C-alpha cells in the first residue's frame, strides 16, 4: 500500500441532482478538503459534458447511454489518470471494471428494490443491474443507517458484512442575516408547521394534511420541495386532492424547490417540524430541524427513531388522529415536547460531516490493507 493514498470522488451529481444526493456530495467535498494531509489526498471527478436535455423518449435514451458510458468508461479512466487508489461513488453505481484501484459505493436506501412501481421499468432494470455489479466489485457498500443496512441486505442480497454504516449529518446552512424573502414575508404571518422534502409517495403527505385539518384553523402547513424526478413516484395529485378534500387551499403552502437560504428561512420561523414518512434511509431533515431547535414529530418507523432518538416525539404513520394529537402537543408546549427539545443537542453532537469524511478514509485504508493481504 503506497505511503500517500489518493482518493477519487465521483462528483457527477453535483451538477445534476437537486436534493439529497447533491447535498451529500457537496458536504462530502467540503469535509474531504479538510482531510488533506501527507497520508491522504483527494481528487474530484466530473463529466466533461452535461446530460442530454428534454423529456422525450430519445432524450431519455441518450441520458441512459451517457450514464453508462460515464460510469463504466469515463470514471475508471479519470481515476487511473489521476493516480487514485480508491474511488468513491455516492449514487449507488460504481464501475464494474476497476483496474489499478478499488471502489466504495453508497446506497442511500433500498427504495429501488422496495418500490419498483415508482420507477420506469426499463430504466430500473438497467440501474439495478449496474448498481449490483459495481457493489459486488467494491471493497464496501456504505449505508446511512443500521435500518438502511438491514433493508439493503434484505432486498439486494448483498452480504451484510460488506455493508458499512456511515451516518450522515445535517446540511450546512449559511446564517440568516435578514428576513427579506418576499414569499416568506407574505406567508408566515400565521404560525406554521413545516415539512421539507420531495413530494414523493413514501413521504405520506396526504396523511399529514388530514392530521393538520384537525387543528385550529389559524395555523398553516408549509410543504417545502417539488415533485420527484420520477413521474411514477409523484404524489402531487394525491396531495392536491387531500388539500381540496379538507378545504385547506388557504392554509397549506407548497413552495416548490427553494434555495438553501430560503429553506433556512422557513426552518427559522416554523413552530414545529413534522416527518410522516413511511420509509427513509436516513431522514436528514430531522437533524436540520434540530439545528433550528424545532420541536419534531416523526413517524415511529424505518430509521427515524434511530436518527432522531429522544429529540423527537413519534406517531403511527397510518394514524392521522395520533399525528394530530402530537402536533397539538407542539402548540401546547407539553412537558414531552420540552424534554425532546432538551435532548436535541446531545443527539446533534453525534453527527458531523467531518466524521463522515473520516469514516470514508478509514474504510478506504482498511479496504486497501485487506486487499494487499490477499494480493
Where would I find each of the regions flagged by the language model?
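Carbohydrate transferase catalytic cores enriched for Leloir-type hexosyltransferases
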Residues: 1-375
Amino acid at each position: 500500500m503506497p505511503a500517500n493514498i489518493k482518493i477519487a470522488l465521483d462528483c457527477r451529481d453535483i451538477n445534476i441532482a437537486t436534493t439529497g444526493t447533491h447535498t451529500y456530495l457537496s458536504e462530502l467535498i467540503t469535509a474531504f478538503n479538510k482531510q488533506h494531509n501527507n497520508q491522504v489526498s483527494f481528487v474530484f471527478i466530473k463529466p466533461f459534458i452535461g446530460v442530454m436535455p428534454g423529456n422525450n423518449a430519445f432524450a431519455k435514451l441518450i441520458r441512459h447511454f451517457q450514464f453508462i458510458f460515464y460510469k463504466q468508461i469515463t470514471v475508471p479512466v479519470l481515476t487511473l489518470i489521476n493516480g487514485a487508489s480508491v474511488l468513491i461513488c455516492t449514487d449507488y453505481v460504481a464501475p464494474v471494471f476497476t483496474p489499478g484501484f478499488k471502489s466504495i459505493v453508497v446506497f442511500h436506501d433500498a427504495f429501488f428494490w422496495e418500490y419498483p412501481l415508482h420507477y420506469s421499468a426499463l430504466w430500473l432494470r438497467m440501474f439495478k443491474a449496474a448498481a449490483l455489479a459495481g457493489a459486488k466489485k467494491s471493497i464496501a457498500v456504505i449505508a446511512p443507517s443500521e435500518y438502511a443496512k438491514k433493508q439493503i441486505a434484505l432486498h439486494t442480497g448483498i452480504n451484510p458484512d460488506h455493508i458499512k454504516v456511515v451516518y450522515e449529518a445535517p446540511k450546512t446552512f449559511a446564517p440568516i442575516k435578514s428576513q427579506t424573502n418576499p414569499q416568506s414575508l407574505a406567508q408566515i404571518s400565521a404560525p406554521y408547521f413545516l415539512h421539507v422534502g420531495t413530494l414523493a409517495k413514501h413521504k405520506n403527505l396526504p396523511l399529514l394534511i388530514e392530521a393538520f385539518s384537525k387543528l385550529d384553523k389559524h395555523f398553516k402547513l408549509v410543504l417545502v420541495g417539488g415533485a420527484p424526478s420520477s413521474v411514477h413516484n409523484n404524489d402531487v395529485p394525491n396531495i392536491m386532492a387531500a388539500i381540496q378534500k379538507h378545504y385547506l387551499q388557504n392554509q397549506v403552502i407548497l413552495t416548490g424547490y427553494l434555495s438553501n437560504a430560503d429553506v433556512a428561512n422557513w426552518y427559522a420561523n416554523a413552530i414545529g417540524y413534522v416527518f410522516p414518512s413511511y420509509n427513509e434511509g436516513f431522514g436528514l431533515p430531522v437533524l436540520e430541524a434540530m439545528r433550528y431547535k424545532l420541536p419534531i414529530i416523526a413517524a415511529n418507523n424505518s430509521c427515524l427513531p434511530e436518527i432522531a432518538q429522544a429529540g423527537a416525539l413519534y406517531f403511527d404513520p397510518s394514524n392521522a388522529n395520533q399525528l394530530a394529537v402530537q402536533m397539538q402537543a407542539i402548540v401546547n408546549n407539553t412537558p414531552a415536547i420540552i424534554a425532546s427539545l432538551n435532548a436535541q443537542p446531545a443527539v446533534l453532537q453525534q453527527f458531523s460531516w467531518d466524521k463522515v469524511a473520516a469514516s470514508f478514509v478509514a474504510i478506504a485504508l482498511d479496504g486497501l490493507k485487506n486487499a494487499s493481504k490477499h494480493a
